Design a protein with these regions (language model features):
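Gly/Ser-rich helix-loop-strand patches that form or flank binding pockets
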Residues: 1-4, 79-131, 223-264
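Residue-level recognition of beta-strand->loop/alpha-helix junctions
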Residues: 46-49, 71, 124, 172, ...
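A short, acidic, amphipathic alpha-helical segment used as a generic capping/interface helix at domain edges
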Residues: 192, 212-222
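Charged docking surfaces used in two-component/phosphorelay signaling
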Residues: 52, 71-77, 209-216
Length: 264
């Protein structure tokens, strides 16, 4: 049974938003998509930026959200994680330019997934229109699971977000043919996970995909028009069904054209 209470038990939480985008490239639409976390007592956003601009400070202040600017001319993994620690952040948001330095960008993503003890939301600089339902990127979530320890932590994190979640599509990816017994056990596990979500007032459905894990997760996101993907971070041991490669979370975070939340 998944335990609840992944987020720190404190009245106020802080978000660290790391970006190398210039002022004209940074999407306010995307920021609006993240703002539903206000309902979870996230009261402050610390912007870790390579460029000194503060055009959003007043707008966020009008929404009763504190904000500050921290300058870092490189945005390397250790610098981002150090800033998150110094700011006592509960969640890291990373918004990197997809057009410049892809190899460097992917390397930073990989190191962050490996080393972070905090959940990281890779926004992937999406400019997709946010649904006008108040839930932003939490309106429709694809949750990829293999029931490993990391996946169960990701589910626990999502349960903490149940107040702002819309629809959840629970996805498991298999490789090769399963026996009738294995398929029955898989369906039972999916049903158990779905029940946990339903018991927490989360509208959830479950699905089985077959193929390369990262590719099928991205396919599921397209199939269900997801606004965000949630996946557990890399594990030393593979999941019970040996379905996830250690690099799946990294591949999804690098290749997706929508936000990806990786829970360590």
């Amino acid at each position: 049974m998944t335990k609840k209470g992944y987020l720190p038990s404190m009245e106020a939480r802080k978000l660290l938003y790391a970006t190398d985008l210039k002022e004209k490239s940074l999407s306010f639409n995307l920021l609006k998509g993240i703002l539903p976390v206000r309902e979870l007592d996230f009261y402050e956003i610390a912007f870790l930026q390579t460029t000194p601009y503060d055009s959003w400070i007043k707008g966020l202040s009008d929404l009763n959200i504190k904000s500050k600017i921290i300058l870092d001319d490189q945005l390397l993994p250790h610098g981002i994680l150090k800033a998150a620690k110094n700011e006592e952040a509960s969640l890291i948001v990373v918004n990197f330019d997809r057009e410049e330095g892809k190899t460097s960008r992917n390397s930073v993503i990989r190191q962050l997934i490996k080393k972070s003890s905090l959940p990281i939301l890779f926004t992937n600089n999406t400019n997709k229109e946010i649904k006008p339902d108040g839930k932003g990127i939490f309106a429709c979530v694809v949750f990829a699971t293999d029931w490993s320890y990391k996946s169960e932590k990701a589910l626990a994190f999502l349960l903490d977000f149940k107040k702002i979640l819309g629809e959840m599509e629970i996805v498991n990816v298999i490789k090769g043919k399963l026996t009738i017994k294995e398929m029955r056990e898989l369906k039972n596990r999916l049903a158990e996970t779905r029940k946990i979500c339903l018991d927490n007032k989360i509208d959830a459905e479950s699905h089985i995909y077959a193929g390369k894990t990262s590719e099928e997760i991205l396919t599921a996101a397209k199939d269900y028009k997801a606004a965000m993907i949630v996946i557990g971070g890399e594990s030393e041991k593979k999941g019970l069904n040996r379905l996830f490669k250690k690099s799946s979370s990294w591949e999804v975070a690098c290749e997706a054209d929508l936000p990806v939340l990786v829970v360590p």
